[in-house]
Amino acid sequence: MNRPIAESFLNRADHRVLRRILLPLSLWHLLNLEIAKSPYFFGNTFPLVKDLRIAVTICTTLFPQLPDFSQKRLMGDWLRSWRCNFLTETAKFRCYLEDFNALPQLWKKPEIRPSGERESVGLPWALAIVTSVCGSTGWSAETVWNMPVGQAYWYHVAFAMQKGCSVDLLSEGEMEAIERVRAKKAKQ
């Protein structure tokens, strides 16, 4: 069996960061992390304590609720977690992200666009996945937005393949070869 498939359907349910139990990482959480410009989503800067508290608040909120960023909530989070070691909690949050981020590994075809041609803008990726899975299954938007991200993405890819889309998944051997090359480059 393809390792990312197994990883996306077999997740730990005991992720706890800043003494709060996190929900399975969902498209709703990723959308909110993106909107909040979270360093945990973009990875462009090292997160601050405030970034971790915001990310934890987001990842404890179900669709369609909005995360509670009120001063009262953030102060309560601070009081509950002020003795926590920030680096340890950040490592735990990154472990949580990695546990649920088991997406299909696809071969990407190079895009060749004539010079001067306008870049096309499609649906935001999270919305595209939600509409695809809802349209293919009849499941409610709430069910799909709250579904673990790996599962939703795998369903999306599977339905696309069933509809005849050309999707080229990486094999186990190809993924291992890519990992070996990355490890070799990292040592250089």
Protein language model features and the residues they cover:
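An amphipathic, hydrophobic-aromatic interaction surface with interspersed Lys/Arg
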Residues: 1-50, 54-63, 73-167
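Extended accessory and catalytic-adjacent subdomains in large enzymes
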Residues: 68-71
